[in-house]
Amino acid sequence: MEIWLLILASLSGSLLLHLLLRRRNSSSPPLPPDPNFLPFLGTLQWLREGLGGLESYLRSVHHRLGPIVTLRITSRPAIFVADRSLTHEALVLNGAVYADRPPPAVISKIVDEHNISSGSYGATWRLLRRNITSEILHPSRVRSYSHARHWVLEILFERFRNHGGEEPIVLIHHLHYAMFALLVLMCFGDKLDEKQIKEVEFIQRLQLLSLTKFNIFNIWPKFTKLILRKRWQEFLQIRRQQRDVLLPLIRARRKIVEERKRSEQEDKKDYVQSYVDTLLDLELPEENRKLNEEDIMNLCSEFLTAGTDTTATALQWIMANLVKYPEIQERLHEEIKSVVGEEAKEVEEEDVEKMPYLKAVVLEGLRRHPPGHFLLPHSVTEDTVLGGYKVPKNGTINFMVAEIGRDPVEWEEPMAFKPERFMGEEEAVDLTGSRGIKMMPFGAGRRICPGIGLAMLHLEYYVANMVREFQWKEVQGHEVDLTEKLEFTVVMKHPLKALAVPRRCH
């Protein structure tokens, strides 16, 4: 305890001196208001409450001080924005200035180096993002994975039918496995068996849920590694396990690609390009070298995590509301029947484009329950002004997704689940935010999630098919509880338990 008090006192003293020196320059705009007179109080708040508790604290701070505030969580001031107009001004109208990320911390340098979500804004980042958007997430490429989506749908339905309509289903377990199986196929190009999929899923999940525990090494790493040696060794052990699981899959795919090149196979009928395929020959422009195995592993890990957790979490929230409000579920079912009829085997991907209420249900789920309540932190490339306040060069700025999507000025009864709010609008809500931000579950501007189209397809396709095939009912004694809990994404504190009653005889 004495060590931590010494750390905080030293940090506070340096920050206080820094503040006093800055205030001598009265010509520049001030930083956004800080609720804490003493800088170290922001650090204490973060250490005590974590990111989950920080959100409710920020909500009260914004209510008192306005839509843009400063907290000193580390030695750098962190700015938080909870206003859609200011967010649009920053991310869209002034996007190039706000497109960078804060310098990578110790943990990030190991698990996130050369990735898309956390990489610095520059030539390498542009190359990696262009690669995934053109080679994997382009609409023509997305269509080529339709067989994989159908395969995963069959896995889900088989699991649901095994419960017989009378045994409660903990939905998130099945959704997470199914989405992970789909992303593994897209990443490595093969349908792995259940044992292999679960092995990859386990190590990815272990790394993901442990990151918050390891974030302590980002604060004075030489010191924290010394006093928390066992925890540091635990982190390194997880990385070794990840290499043991992922590298054989990457090497196997490399071998397949090289054999195809040697044999000059022209028949592409049964060949579907995987994410790994696109990475093997990429050359980093800033280092004049190809991606090494560690780089490829990190990019594959990012791909699996980004495409699995957010989608599975969003699916659970949407299905929870359909169970809680059966009248919404039945209206959706009627729309599905009117489009595909009674005899169709499943709802095809082309069918969902004809279902406006389905889209409204998905959009309302993303508005009311965005999987991420904050965008990943942005960093500015030069001194700039936002809302009359200074955002200093290299300063960290955070945008509050959930608060913007629940703004009572924009949304009537923002905490209610009302899909009809997206029906009959003269101008549909622009999820990209380019015309204005009303909600931004995928971010906005130059750092918008590149998988937005794929995610929307997955959400609409799987919700439509689950509702068409099963009637989802509340389990007696287990009322749907929409209380939130922060993990990697914001999940249901009490996971959804429901009955899946088949609607049709097979």
Curated annotation (Swiss-Prot):
Known EC number: 1.14.-.-
InterPro entries hit by this protein: Cyt_P450, Cyt_P450_CS, Cyt_P450_E_grp-I, Cyt_P450_sf, Plant_metabolite_P450s
Alphabetized PROSITE patterns for the sequence: CYTOCHROME_P450 (PS00086)
Obligatory cofactor(s): heme
Gene Ontology cellular-component annotations: membrane
Bilayer topology term: Single-pass membrane protein
Enzyme class: oxidoreductase
Residues reported in the UniProt entry to bind heme: C449
Membrane-traversing stretches: 1-21
GO terms assigned for molecular function: heme binding; iron ion binding; monooxygenase activity; oxidoreductase activity, acting on paired donors, with incorporation or reduction of molecular oxygen
Disulphides: none
Keywords: Heme, Iron, Membrane, Metal-binding, Monooxygenase, Oxidoreductase, Transmembrane, Transmembrane helix
Compartments where found: Membrane
UniProt record similarity statement: Belongs to the cytochrome P450 family.
PANTHER family (alphabetical): CYTOCHROME P450 89A2-RELATED, FLAVONOID 3'-MONOOXYGENASE-RELATED
Record's protein name: Cytochrome P450 89A2
Species in which this protein is naturally found: Arabidopsis thaliana (Mouse-ear cress)
